[in-house]
From Swiss-Prot:
Listed EC numbers: 2.1.1.174
HAMAP family xrefs: 23SrRNA_methyltr_G (MF_01859)
Organism field: Shigella boydii serotype 18 (strain CDC 3083-94 / BS512)
Catalysed reactions, as listed in the record: guanosine(1835) in 23S rRNA + S-adenosyl-L-methionine = N(2)-methylguanosine(1835) in 23S rRNA + S-adenosyl-L-homocysteine + H(+)
InterPro entries: DNA_methylase_N6_adenine_CS, rRNA_m2G-MeTrfase_RlmG, RsmC/RlmG, SAM-dependent_MTases_sf, Small_mtfrase_dom
A GO molecular function held by the record: nucleic acid binding
Keywords: Cytoplasm, Methyltransferase, rRNA processing, S-adenosyl-L-methionine, Transferase
Protein purpose: Specifically methylates the guanine in position 1835 (m2G1835) of 23S rRNA.
Family statement: Belongs to the methyltransferase superfamily. RlmG family.
NCBIfam families (UniProt xref): PRK15001.1
Protein name, UniProt field: Ribosomal RNA large subunit methyltransferase G
GO cellular component: cytoplasm
Enzyme class: transferase
Length: 378
C-alpha cells in the first residue's frame, strides 16, 4: 500500500492484483499528483471524465465530484473499486464506462492518463471530440519520457491547440483547448489477413499487436493441442487468433475467450463472427480478471500468452494470477499451455504451482510450456 496526499483528500492506495512486499509497486505516480495539483484552485463545473485511471488514484481523489472513469481495463475498474472501499468512499461515487461507450456531454474537466498505445489514445480523443466544448478543461499526464512529439501532434489533430508543461518529478502534463479542427473519419478496427488461412483478423484500438500477428502467437500456433473435447480457454485472448485456431483444430470443443480488455473481447467475438460464424455456438466471450469467479474443475485445457507488464510497469503478478486461476479451474489431468519469452523463466513458476512442467518447444526467443493438474495436489 502507498499513501497519496493531494488537495482533495488523503488516500491509501494499493495495486490490483497486489504486489509482493519485497518488491512493492506503487499504485499511483507523479503524473497523478501533477494532474490533481492543476485542479486545486479550479472550480469544477459539469461532468468530470477521467480516462485510463490505472488504480483509481484520480477517481478516489475526485470522488465528491461523481466522476466518470473511462478505460479499457476491467482490472483497473476492480482496482478503483477496491481503493474506494479501502478509503471508505461509496463505490457509487464513480461511474465506470468502457472506452467504446458514449461519453457524457459537455464535461467540465477531462483528465487523461496517456495510455501506452497511440491507437487507444486516438480512439479516446475522437470520442471526446464529440462531447467536449471550448470551455472544457482538458489535461493529460504521463511520465515525461512517455510524451512524444507524436502524442502532442495527435492532440492537435483531433482536438486543437496543445501545450506542454515543464517536467515535475519526471512527469509532464499536456494542456489542450478544443477548437474542432477538420478531421477525417477513421475506421473502428484495423484488419489484416492471417497468413496460411483465408481469415481476416479485425482489431480494436487497444488490442496487442493490432497491425499483425505477433511472433509469440505465431510460434504458439505451431504447437496448439488438437482433437480436444469439452471446454478450452483462450486466457488473455487479445484478438482471439489463438482461440479461433483452437476452434478450427478442435471441432468437438467449446472455446471460452477471456480478457480483461473489453476491446479484446469485442475483437475476438468479431473475428469468430466473420471467420467462423458456424462456430459461434461453440464460443463464449468473457470480460474478466483472469478466471475470477469461475467454478473450479471446469475446463479441459487452458492456453495462455501471459503479459509481463501491467500498464507501464514490468511485473509478473498478472501472469502469476493467471497460472493460479488456471490450475483451480482445470479438471484433474487437464493441461495449461503457455508461450512466453525465454528470459521470464516461467518453467520454475509453473513447476512450483502445478508440481510439474514440460517444455513443448523452444526457439531463440520463446518457449512453449505445458503443466498438468494432478489429482494429488490441492
Amino acid at each position: 500500500m502507498s499513501h497519496l496526499d493531494n488537495g482533495f483528500r488523503s488516500l491509501t492506495l494499493q495495486r490490483f492484483p497486489a504486489t509482493d512486499d519485497v518488491n512493492p509497486l506503487q499504485a499511483w505516480e507523479a503524473a497523478d499528483e501533477y494532474l490533481l495539483q492543476q485542479l486545486d484552485d479550479t472550480e469544477i463545473r459539469g461532468p468530470v471524465l477521467i480516462l485510463n485511471d490505472a488504480f483509481g488514484a484520480l477517481s478516489c481523489a475526485l470522488a465528491e465530484h461523481k466522476p466518470y472513469s473511462i478505460g479499457d481495463s476491467y482490472i483497473s475498474e476492480l482496482a478503483t473499486r477496491e481503493n474506494l472501499r479501502l478509503n471508505g468512499i461509496d463505490e457509487s461515487s464513480v461511474k465506470f464506462l468502457d472506452s467504446t461507450a458514449d461519453y457524457p456531454q459537455q464535461p467540465g474537466v477531462v483528465l487523461i492518463k496517456v495510455p501506452k498505445t497511440l491507437a487507444l489514445l486516438e480512439q479516446q480523443l475522437r470520442a471526446l471530440r464529440k462531447v467536449v466544448t471550448s470551455d472544457t478543461r482538458i489535461i493529460a499526464g504521463a511520465k515525461a519520457r512517455d510524451i512524444h512529439t507524436s502524442t502532442l501532434e495527435l492532440f492537435e489533430k483531433v482536438l486543437g491547440p496543445t501545450t506542454t508543461t515543464l517536467a515535475w518529478k519526471k512527469a509532464r502534463l499536456i494542456n489542450c483547448t478544443f477548437n474542432e479542427p477538420p478531421l477525417a473519419d477513421a475506421p473502428q478496427t484495423v484488419s489484416w489477413k492471417l497468413e496460411g488461412t483465408d481469415w481476416t483478423i479485425h482489431n480494436h484500438a487497444n488490442v496487442f499487436s493490432r497491425t499483425g500477428l505477433d511472433i509469440g502467437a505465431r510460434f504458439f500456433m505451431q504447437h496448439l493441442p488438437e482433437n480436444l473435447e469439452g471446454e478450452i480457454v483462450d486466457l488473455g485472448c487479445g484478438n482471439g487468433v489463438i482461440g479461433l485456431t483452437l476452434l478450427d483444430k478442435n471441432p468437438q470443443a467449446k472455446v471460452v475467450f477471456v480478457d480483461e480488455s473489453p476491446m479484446a473481447v469485442a475483437s475476438s467475438r468479431l473475428n469468430v463472427e466473420t471467420n467462423m460464424p458456424e462456430a459461434l455456438d461453440r464460443s463464449e466471450f468473457m470480460i474478466n480478471n483472469a478466471l475470477s469467479g469461475v467454478e473450479p474443475f471446469r475446463f479441459n485445457a487452458v492456453l495462455c500468452n501471459p503479459p509481463f507488464h501491467q500498464q507501464h510497469a514490468l511485473t509478473d503478478n498478472v501472469a502469476w494470477e493467471m497460472f493460479h486461476h488456471a490450475r483451480r479451474c482445470l479438471k484433474i489431468n487437464s493441461e495449461l499451455y503457455i508461450v512466453a519469452n525465454r528470459h521470464l523463466d516461467y518453467f520454475h513458476k509453473l513447476k512450483k504451482i502445478f508440481g510439474n512442467c514440460t517444455t513443448i518447444a523452444t526457439n531463440n526467443k520463446f518457449v512453449v510450456l505445458k503443466a498438468v493438474k494432478l489429482g494429488r495436489r490441492r
